[in-house]
A protein has these predicted regions:
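Interdomain/boundary linker segments immediately adjacent to catalytic/signaling cores
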Residues: 1-75
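Short, surface-exposed basic-aromatic patches at helix termini and helix-loop junctions that form
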Residues: 40-46, 91-94, 114-120
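Beta-rich catalytic cores
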Residues: 85
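Short, flexible loop/turn elements at secondary-structure junctions
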Residues: 93, 104-106, 129
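Acidic, metal/cofactor-coordinating or nucleic-acid-engaging core segments within structured domains
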Residues: 116-145
Length: 145
């Protein structure tokens, strides 16, 4: 079984984590949901790639062709295009890039909010809800179709 699949299966066991940066608008706060997700990436053998500041055009090119991603296999980039842009992580395994965005909602909110207004079809969303104290995953394309 691939490391990315094992990671995603363990994500489904995560409880609710609040995304403090999104909730407060202050990006210097600890974003616990992202931290918990990053901890799982590390537990499953992915290593942080030091290269940051990936241009949005590069991200978009990789999104169109996930096999063109140039970061090393078995690595991930956190906040590749900055804290105010998605995704939260680009993960590469077996030559393919995966785009992972963390979303959380409190009791007051019933649905996740998307920076662009709509989910991105090539993204994997890690969604946690306080009301249910559970996490689920879905593809952006599932919402758009």
């Amino acid at each position: 079984m691939s490391k990315i699949r094992q990671f995603l299966e363990q994500v489904l066991q995560m409880p609710y984590y609040k995304n403090y940066a999104a909730a407060s608008g202050k990006v210097h706060n600890i974003a616990k949901h992202e931290d918990a997700t990053e901890d799982l990436l590390i537990q499953h053998g992915f290593t942080k790639h030091s290269k940051g500041g990936i241009p949005k055009k590069q991200r978009d090119d990789w999104l169109k062709d996930p096999y063109s991603c140039t970061i090393p296999d078995g690595t991930y980039v956190s906040q590749p295009t900055g804290k105010q842009d998605s995704p939260d992580f680009i993960v590469k395994e077996n030559g393919r890039a995966y785009f992972i965005e963390c979303k959380s909602v409190s009791k007051k909110t019933k649905a996740p909010m998307y920076n662009s207004g709509v989910p991105k079809s090539g993204y994997i969303y890690v969604f946690t809800a306080k009301k249910y104290n559970q996490t689920t995953i879905y593809n952006g394309s599932d919402i758009l179709s």
